[in-house]
Swiss-Prot record:
Alphabetical keyword list: Chloroplast, Membrane, Photosynthesis, Photosystem II, Plastid, Reaction center, Thylakoid, Transmembrane, Transmembrane helix
Family: Belongs to the PsbM family.
Xref: NCBIfam families: PS_II_psbM
Annotated source species: Tupiella akineta
Protein name: Photosystem II reaction center protein M
Membrane topology per record: Single-pass membrane protein
Top-level taxon of the source organism: Eukaryota
Principal cellular location given in the protein's record: plastid
Subcellular locations according to the entry: Plastid, Chloroplast thylakoid membrane
Amino acid sequence: MEVNILGLMAVALFILIPTSFLLILYVKTASSSD
């Protein structure tokens, strides 16, 4: 179970990091457009 939890956390970070980066770019673009 511990391995599965660590794997899940790794996947979560792998998804959240690029997602947060894209969100920041989107917010900057929206602000520039406005």
